[in-house]
């Protein structure tokens, strides 16, 4: 799976970063990275992870991933919720295999739930999406999960103690592309997971808002369509970060994820959990 793409240089607005989100809902013409690469079929391992469809002018246009953190609340990336008025509607598909759902990408199916509202961080802008890349989707109907299956938020500053190491492992989950290169695209709408490790934190172009994780054949990683999906801390249900951006159009090398352990992020998401 792959997120938005980013060039590893912190330009004035870092607009060269590629968001890993919003691949077109029609998999035949993907535009941004969206799936887990070199990953494993998830099955029912992470039932809180859902596929999100975003409509423009009433028609399905893009897709992302997200995590159910309360029965009617889905956590995702800011660029998946968009700026005010950017999307006319959102819905989720809460099944592991959306590829064979005959209702996709339209509403009304047994595994779809329509959104009543969606919000990105109040400081989010598309032009500098990576700085405040978190959003929520509010659902019209509850997702049925057991209490231990919902994604949970980290404590403030929890990730600061992490050290770049092959032993600092995350579980990335999403519905993004499995492979993309100049001659081949594999874009099955199936929930998958990978186990990337921490490459960079609190330094370089990631700043204090992102982590850089591995993305290779050994660890797997994210791609277009995985945007907004969770990067769980180890094998826990704690969502350390949401998939945000990629470094290149092939979804290879490293991937950027937006940290959730910052106070302003926790305050923003927390208001929808009260």
What name fits each language-model region?
Residues 1-18:
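Sec-dependent bacterial lipoprotein signal peptides
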Residues 40-42, 125-128, 186-187, 219-224:
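Short Gly/Pro-enriched turn/cap motifs at secondary-structure boundaries
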Residues 44-51, 168, 210-211:
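Short, hydrophobic/aromatic-rich segments at coil-to-beta transitions
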Residues 33-44, 58, 88-159, 204:
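Conserved catalytic-core segment of clan PA serine endopeptidases
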Residues 74, 80-82, 124-125, 142-145, ...:
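Solvent-exposed loop/turn segments at secondary-structure junctions
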Residues 51-55, 214-216:
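Short beta-strand segments that buttress and anchor functional surface loops
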Residues 20-35, 48, 52, 63, ...:
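C-terminal subregion of chymotrypsin/trypsin-like serine protease catalytic domains
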Residues 23, 131-219, 256, 262-266:
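Chymotrypsin/trypsin-fold serine protease catalytic domain
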